[in-house]
From Swiss-Prot:
EC number: 7.1.1.-
Descriptive protein name: NAD(P)H-quinone oxidoreductase subunit 5, chloroplastic
Localization, UniProt: Plastid, Chloroplast thylakoid membrane
Organism: Nandina domestica
Bilayer topology: Multi-pass membrane protein
Length: 741
């Protein structure tokens, strides 16, 4: 066992040979390197699998009751200061290692087929391997300096991955937005690290916790300064995990390839912020104001993320806001001190969200054979619908991921979210009400995504989307100004209508005529793909993409059982509590996670009822009515006879506009900060060029003309020099005489 821990330092370095070899190979032997590109994908999966096996062994040792292991190498700079580097293996590290490696392997296998058509295939796997290495280094770090180094590397990898298609202006802008937003958080994190070094004189976690506790007990530190430093540390996590108000980069990060989105949202970048708060939670717990701040940010993010997801049309951006909201639950749990529930939800959400993102990638991949390569179209749920019969395996996987995120038992997220909701009632009834209401919103917008994508008819075959005039396939009215107006006026919280009620879909069916079929055949050729097959209908993805989906389905079905909170009949399923026992004792020394069946069912009934309510409302509004209800007249008469119909339409329009425009937060940031900073920069530029440069240039020009004047005065005659000398002497004598009167 000791040998296992002694060699744990190698974990972050195992994936590095792939990006190094690819980089050197492309420089020295580019042709051979490109011809063996599948080998690099296999090597990436193999190396990460080795780490997964190693991490599983470490986790087993932790479950058996092994203590925390830390190995440190000291680098002495002088007698007063030294830097220590090493690695820390504890329950939190073990959980994160398993999470990163399992999700990473699934994403790499999936990417082999998904990126097979892309010319940047090798660059993609180099970035992915380096990103995995950076995240592994982050979770094994034993001090704040190491964490900050790998923190920046994770941010750099995310910048490269989000901007992978950097030739697209929107992708280049998205990676810059993510980079700048995270610089705000990173600056706060750096200030917090320096502040705690000033307070404690150490970067090590153990010293940091012990010294801070002693100083708090003895009153040896200014509590306001300590709170400020701890809040600055948390600012880094706010930006990394896309919490309010530094969440604006997350939806734009969807401009990268879909496997990148799955990795960032499940196991790397956004998980890094949660990991940082979990790692420093013993420090935060002694500062009540910081814990309240963490829970406040969490509950705001929960509600904001859910409301912003309500009216999104892009399937990946909808999932991005879902990630934002679900990580808000995790942050809320950490702020409440529910360490176990927070990590439990981080695990269950990671597998469910990886399944959903890879499922959305399969959907996008199938839609590209119909629509062509255009992310704006292939990711838009307006053009989907009726995919059940075309991609049945993807549909089943996506449905299970959706139900899991909705909180339907016995899927993974049900167990963790239910635990957070129960703890929230003990912490704050107001927070609990908001969290429960948002659980219903989550079920609503997730099932909305599912219904718009898989139910009804394939909308990409419609020749006319607005129902007003004919348009060509690549000038669909919804993408233009007129179509946008029609949608805004006639559709509320719905992505399509045909001059029908805002609440209901049209009963009409739309047969595909010959002109549309001919038009489709001429437009579906995808020149960027090596596979030149064309089809007027989507098709199921290849087995290489379906295999990770099926494995993640198993995780979604069964990973929740590691944290079942009840112990009956001598059967203890709660593996998670066994693994986290050393960390839980640090915060809740007298806690008992086990509950009986009656208490569990009572607590779960309320949350499941809320989830089913959200699903029912989504089905009522977004499921095609001709497949759900026989009595259409009854429903339509109910809608028309309502005396407050206009009032409710106005309210729903406000909600729709709020959601679709991202809560106007991006507009506010653009107007206030971006344009404000640019205005200040232009003012400084004007002052520099006109005032500073004007003074400098003015002195130079004045000196030049004075010199020119003197040049003409000095003609070489001694009498002229004598005259000027006597003239200036006389002037100085007069001045002297005047001031001495």
């Amino acid at each position: 066992m000791e040998h296992t821990y002694q060699y744990a330092w190698i974990i972050p370095f195992v994936p590095l040979p792939v990006p190094i070899a690819i980089g050197v190979g492309l420089l020295l032997v580019p042709t051979a390197t490109k011809s063996l590109r599948r080998m690099w994908a296999f090597l990436s999966v193999l190396l990460l699998s080795i780490i997964m096996i190693f991490s599983a062994d470490l986790s087993i040792q932790q479950i058996k009751g092994s203590l925390i292991h830390q190995y440190v190498w000291s680098w002495t700079i002088n007698n007063d200061f030294s830097l220590e580097f090493g690695y820390l293996i504890d329950p939190l590290t073990s959980i994160m290692l398993i999470l990163i490696t399992t999700v990473g392997i699934m994403v790499l296998i999936y990417s082999d087929n998904y990126m097979s058509h892309d010319q940047g295939y090798l660059r993609f796997f180099a970035y992915m391997s380096f990103s995995n290495a950076s995240m592994l280094g982050l979770v094994t770090s034993c001090n704040l300096i190491q964490i900050y180094i790998f923190w920046e590397l994770v941010g750099m990898c995310s910048y490269l991955l989000i901007g992978f298609w950097f030739t697209r202006p929107i992708a280049a802008s998205a990676c810059q937005k993510a980079f700048v937003t995270n610089r705000v958080g990173d600056f706060g994190l750096l200030l917090g690290i320096l502040g705690f070094y000033f307070i404690t004189g150490s970067f090590e976690f153990r010293d940091l916790f012990e010294i801070t506790n002693n100083l708090m007990d003895n009153g040896g530190v200014n509590s306001l300064f300590l709170t400020l430093c701890a809040s600055l540390l948390f600012v880094g996590a706010i930006a990394k995990s896309a919490q309010f108000p530094l969440h604006v980069w997350l939806p734009d990060a969807m401009e990268g390839p879909t496997p990148i989105s799955a990795l960032i949202h499940a196991a790397t970048m956004v998980a890094a912020g949660i990991f940082l708060v979990a790692r420093l939670l013993p420090l935060f717990t002694v500062i009540p104001y910081v814990m309240n701040f963490i829970s406040l940010i969490g509950i705001i993010t929960i509600l904001l993320g859910a409301t912003l997801a309500l009216a999104q049309r892009d399937i990946k951006r909808s999932l991005a806001y879902s990630t934002m909201s679900q990580l808000g639950y995790t942050m809320l749990a950490l702020g409440m001190g529910s360490y176990r529930a927070a990590l439990f939800h981080l695990i269950t959400h990671a597998y469910s969200k990886a399944l959903l993102f890879l499922g959305s990638g399969s959907i996008i991949h199938s839609m590209e054979t119909v629509i062509g390569y255009s992310p704006e179209k292939s990711q838009n749920m307006v053009l989907m619908g009726g995919l059940t019969k075309y991609v049945p395996i993807t549909k089943t996987a996506f449905l299970l991921g959706t139900l899991s995120l909705c909180g339907i038992p016995p899927l993974a997220c049900f167990w963790s979210k239910d635990e957070i909701l129960n703890d929230s009632w003990l912490y704050s009834p107001i927070f609990a009400i908001i969290a429960c209401f948002t659980a219903g919103l989550t079920a609503f917008y997730m099932f909305r995504m599912y219904l718009l994508t898989f139910e009804g008819h394939l909308n990409a075959h419609f020749q006319n989307y607005s129902g007003k005039k004919n348009s060509s396939f690549y000038s669909i009215s919804i993408w233009g100004k007129e179509g946008a107006k029609a949608i805004k006026q006639n559709s509320v919280l719905s992505t399509m209508n045909n001059n029908e009620s805002a609440y209901l879909f049209s009963k009409k069916t739309y047969p595909i005529d010959g002109n549309v079929r001919n038009m489709m055949r001429s437009l579906i050729t995808i020149t960027n793909f090596s596979n030149k097959k064309t089809s007027p209908y989507p098709h199921e993805s290849d087995n290489t993409m379906l295999l990770p989906l099926l494995i993640l389905v198993l995780f979604t079905l069964f990973v929740g059982f590691i944290g079942i909170p009840f112990d009956q009949g001598g059967i203890d399923f709660d593996i998670l509590s066994k693994l986290l026992t050393p960390s839980i004792n640090l915060l809740h020394s007298n806690s008992n996670n086990s509950v009986d069946w009656y208490e569990f069912v009572t607590n779960a009934f309320f949350s499941v009822s809320i989830a089913y309510s959200g699903i029912f409302i989504a089905s009522l509004l977004y499921r095609p009515v001709y497949s759900s209800f026989q009595n259409l007249d009854l429903i339509n008469s109910f809608v028309k006879m309502s005396p407050k119909r206009i009032f409710w339409d106005k309210i729903i329009n406000v909600i729709y506009n709020w959601s679709y425009n991202r809560g106007y937060i991006d507009v506010f940031y653009t107007t206030t900060f971006t344009r404000g900073i640019r205005g200040v920069a232009e003012l400084i530029y004007f002052f520099d060029r006109q005032v500073i440069d004007g003074i400098t240039n003015g002195v130079g020009i004045t000196s030049f003309f004075v010199g020119e004047g003197i040049k003409y005065v000095g003609g070489g005659r001694i009498s002229s020099y004598l005259f000027l000398y006597l003239f200036y002497v006389s002037i100085f004598l007069l001045i002297y005489y005047f001031f001495n009167l």
